[in-house]
Each structure stands twice: as C-alpha cells, then as structure tokens.
Design a protein with these regions (language model features):
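Short N-terminal binding/cap micro-motifs at the start of the first secondary-structure element
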Residues: 16-22, 50, 319-320
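N-terminal beta-loop-helix "entrance" segment that forms/cooperates
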Residues: 30-33, 37-61
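Short hydrophobic alpha-helical runs that function as membrane-insertion/retention elements
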Residues: 40, 63-65, 105-106, 188-190, ...
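Bateman/CBS regulatory modules and CBS-like beta-alpha motifs in cytosolic regions of diverse proteins
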Residues: 66-96, 108, 114, 141-156, ...
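A glycine-centered beta-loop-beta connector
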Residues: 76, 97, 105-123, 276, ...
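A short, polar/charged loop-to-alpha-helix boundary motif
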Residues: 120-137, 301-310
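Long, charge-dense
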Residues: 132-133, 221-259
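Conserved small/polar residues in nucleotide/adenosyl-binding loops
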Residues: 324
Length: 325
C-alpha cells in the first residue's frame, strides 16, 4: 500500500514565519503541476498570527505540522494481516502460517487488542510433546476444534462443549483391556467395534471419537445420550486421529503472552532496526495510536523502506534544518 514516506515533503525552517510557510505551499504546488513528484507542504512549528491571517485571507489550508522527517513504522510497507483468536487450533494456525508464508501470528481479542503471539517454533514444540495425554483438558479444547482438525461430525452432544477432564486413550484393544485403562472423563479414540464403544460409555468417558467414518448405531447413540457421553464420527483412521488430536489444542495455551517485542506506528525506523539487530524474531506486531493491533513488520519490510525525500525551502542557515532532518 502507498505510504507517506513515498511523498516528497516540502518544508521551511523551524519557528516558521509567513514567507517560510508560503514558500513551502507554493513550491509543493509548483512541483505537483510541473513534475511527476507527489509533493506535500509541511511546517516545522506553530504558525504565528500573521501567517494564520494570510492563509485564511486567501482560503489556503494550513500545512500539517512536521517536526521530524525521519521515517516511522507507519512509513514502512508492513503486512496488514488480521489477528487470529486464541481459540484457534494449533493445526489451523500452522495452516495459516503455511499459506501466508509467515512464521509468527498475532493473537487478538474480539476488539483487536493484542493478546499474544504464536510462532512456528511454539507449534513444533507442542507437536513434539505427544506424551501429554491430558493436554486437551489442560488447554480447555473445544469440541469444535476437534471436529475441524479431524474433519469430523458431531453425532451426540454439542460442538460448543469443552474438554475439561480426562486423558486421550486409543481404544483399539479388546473391551477387557479397555475396562482397565479407560477412566471417567477420558477421550477415547475408537473404531466401529460395538463392544468397545459400549465399554467406553459404561466407563463414563466424556467423548468418543469413532474413526474411519463408521456409522454409530442408534442403540449406542441412545445409551450415550442417557449417560451424557458425547460422540463424534471422523473420516480418518485411528493412527491419523492419534497424530492429529494434540493439534486440536487452542493456541492460547502455547502462545507468548508477556514481554512481547512490539512497535507502534510512530516508532522511528532507526530504533526498530537497532532492536531487530539484537533479537532473532523475524516478525513483530504493530499497534496503532489507540493501542490496537494493526499489522506485522519484518526485517525485510524495514530494509525495503524507500528513503524519504525532502525539499527544504527558505533555509538560509545550517541550523534551520536541524529540527527536521
């Protein structure tokens, strides 16, 4: 998108008088009419009463204040990508990173407040922690996340329910073995074996995930409803379900919440460059004047910044330009 830095700023000296401001306005207008440049008049200080009178007399809009022409983050072609909610699954976050070719995502609230960031490293770490069978309960994973990740459908229960207890169990063993492993509140991954499904329900599991797209019998559905056990049907096999189930956890459980390296739209690019040289992150969130999230900036964006072009008018002394250049 076009940025202010791509315009040519025409500006007079500090503590401007009438000739300084009028020179900037006139020369900016001349360059706009006689060249391909896009020029904008600015002033390097407050206008005096004489200047205000002259501009009002001729119906000329006063130029905007500009006491510093050094580039800010708002002048950089940063990525205006939307934030994602903390309820987003690890799998979905990874897919967004893959599609957008970015390794850091901002996590925002409904009113666009920055809540944290999730990186591809965070997702990789979570995926390697496969032995934590209680992760869905710890992270308060929604059934909706599980359905989305496994491509499943809800057979018994509500999509908005949340995993609050239990461990993940793979129920491919015999019903006799299931009786000794499944506990109340567990999440059990099963096939179409009727006896195993019934055993898991009788052991008061909280959720059954029936794999291979198998249909769930009416009797099992009725008993599950009576026992308060939710049932899902998923097209994947038990191996894939076991691999994907931990990726259903929400990113809010893994994201970085504190000490987030972020910038504002008015942060000088020089300061940003110094910070980026000291840390290994590639993308950094940007906040607007209201403290709301508005985009991400990377080293590449900063390097690609076009230098700001300036035309100085009515500058007779070297000290005249110190306040703006």
């Amino acid at each position: 998108m076009p940025k202010t830095a791509h315009k040519v700023v025409v500006i007079g000296h500090r503590n401007p008088d009438t000739d300084s401001i009028c020179s900037a306005i006139a020369y900016a207008e001349l360059k706009n009419k006689t060249s391909d440049l896009v020029c904008e008049a600015r002033r390097a200080g407050k206008m005096n009463q004489e200047t205000e009178f002259v501009l009002k007399k001729f119906g000329v809009k006063p130029p905007r204040m500009c006491t510093d022409v050094n580039p800010k983050i708002r002048d950089v072609d940063y990525r205006e990508m939307p934030g994602i909610p903390g309820t987003t699954s690890l799998r979905k976050a990874w897919e967004i990173m893959r599609d957008k070719q970015i390794d850091t995502l901002p996590v925002t609230s409904p009113d666009n407040e920055l809540e944290g960031v999730i990186t591809v490293k965070d997702i990789a770490t979570a995926n390697m922690d496969v032995f934590d069978t209680g992760i869905l309960a710890k992270s308060q994973t929604t059934y909706r996340n599980i359905l989305e990740t496994l491509g499943g459908t809800m057979v018994v229960g509500r999509e908005d329910d949340v995993c609050t207890t239990g461990h993940i169990r793979i129920g491919t063993a015999t019903p006799e073995m299931l009786e000794n492993t499944v506990e109340k509140g567990d999440i059990v991954i099963l096939t179409n074996r009727y006896e195993s499904q019934l055993c898991a329900i009788e052991k008061e599991a909280s959720l059954l995930i029936i794999c291979n797209g198998s249909k769930v019998g009416h009797t099992i559905q009725r008993i599950a409803e009576e026992m308060g056990v939710a049932i899902m049907s998923a097209p994947v096999d038990t191996y894939a379900a076991g691999k994907l189930i931990s990726q259903c956890a929400p990113i809010s459980y893994y994201m970085t919440r504190s000490d987030i390296m972020k910038f504002t739209l008015v942060t000088p690019v020089a300061d940003v460059t110094r910070v980026m040289a000291k840390v290994r992150h590639r993308y950094f969130p940007i906040l607007d004047e209201d403290g709301k999230y508005c985009g991400m900036v990377s080293r590449r964006n900063v390097i690609a910044l076009r230098k700001r072009r300036i035309i100085l008018v009515d500058h007779n002394e070297a000290t005249d330009r110190k306040s703006v250049v």
